[in-house]
């Protein structure tokens, strides 16, 4: 195969991927689709350029328009989140977390964070960003029956351990967490609160989750491509008093060039969220509740039924009694139903290859125009595959043909999965 043929093969594989996504029920809780306007920014000349430092303080020439774009994106973000200070340069949520650890801690400090099986993110653990910073880790006590922080035990542990920082938020994130209660006690011992909003940033932007900044978090980190329907990247919101320190920990700390095409795309997506975010967030959560209820009625062990299942985009099920969960996820994928196996609080952290749980998110389907009635059909497809052992691939593909466009965007109605050729 020639070099040209290999390049064409990659192009064709990418086209195949687009077509597969168009035909699939994507319930991965950490993904989304963007509007055409956002995709155009990602494909712009900015993808070729470099800018180190803050607007007006660049180490490179040729940044006049880049400065203006970044300043506009920051201003839009401050408006959307009502934040004192915003940094849009992290290239991912993990990079945002790492910069926050550098800003608020030093090696050897104690960090309290949620264990991964109980919903925490790996970047809060010693094997990832927290470990890179050289932090000691102690777990935030959780009440697994409600999939949330055990407030009394946590406050007691904060007073006992006197950590330097506490991380709330995570990757299995069904309900708002008690930020204000934790922040009050954190102040007593001089601890700072970092709220990892990677999964729920779009719900916070839509005023439908909680407002961690107002509730007392010192830093809020986020991913810009999960419930927030923007480009791959990260963001940091914080109080003005630590803003410059955070900026310095991003650059030159953990970021050099900050992927300028993604920054411009983030600005466009932020403007869209200011316009459509409330409706989008409302529908995303309504869809999650509807999906959870429909699965529960079909006999699935959906977590937290007595709490209404969820107040976010996520739905979690314990399906261990129905068979090998890893094989189950692969079988669903074969049928164009894409979701992920997930550790649950009662799983060992080393069982990630075959845990008890399945995690789903409704944000991408919501962006495709799904509402509550469609969620019932999604649940039925899942039941037919998992419980009835049916092949529904053709049915799913046919069903998805009515939901190929992007909603909650300035260019609403544009195709969401077409391959853009130049």
From Swiss-Prot:
Reaction equations catalysed: 5,10-methylenetetrahydromethanopterin + glycine + H2O = 5,6,7,8-tetrahydromethanopterin + L-serine
Protein keywords: Amino-acid biosynthesis, Cytoplasm, One-carbon metabolism, Pyridoxal phosphate, Transferase
Metabolic or biological pathway, per its Swiss-Prot or TrEMBL entry: Amino-acid biosynthesis; glycine biosynthesis; glycine from L-serine: step 1/1
Enzyme Commission (EC) number: 2.1.2.-
Record's signal peptide: none
GO annotations of cellular component type: cytoplasm
CDD domains the record matches: SHMT
Keyword Transferase (UniProt): yes
Functional summary from the UniProt entry: Catalyzes the reversible interconversion of serine and glycine with tetrahydromethanopterin (H4MPT) serving as the one-carbon carrier. Also exhibits a pteridine-independent aldolase activity toward beta-hydroxyamino acids, producing glycine and aldehydes, via a retro-aldol mechanism.
Family as reported in the entry's similarity comment: Belongs to the SHMT family.
Name this protein carries in UniProt: Serine hydroxymethyltransferase
Protein species of origin: Methanosphaera stadtmanae (strain ATCC 43021 / DSM 3091 / JCM 11832 / MCB-3)
Taxonomic classification: Archaea, Methanobacteriati, Methanobacteriota, Methanomada group, Methanobacteria
